[in-house]
């Protein structure tokens, strides 16, 4: 299974001339410009509430600054605010991008409902 090496950059390249995605592309570029900044600072700057675009921007920053599921989700939770929607997005992204095996087994084992379909 070979997917895209960098889905975020692929999205930007594929949709750069589509007006429908103009606002999304602007936000992605804003987040990419903040890649070297601490995650909690970026979340505070972009918005800690569940509303768009802050939740999208915070989740995207965790994605582009993390190498794996665990580090991205932990970073998202530690940033505070309404982190549930961000953590859901980040977890779904990494599970889809890196595969189900990217989810830490110890997390799965501690979550009763997940045992029935992930182990």
Labelled PLM ranges:
Residues 1-80:
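Accessory "access/gating" subregions that flank catalytic or transport cores
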Residues 54, 58-119:
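Catalytic phosphate/nucleotide-handling subdomain of diverse soluble enzymes
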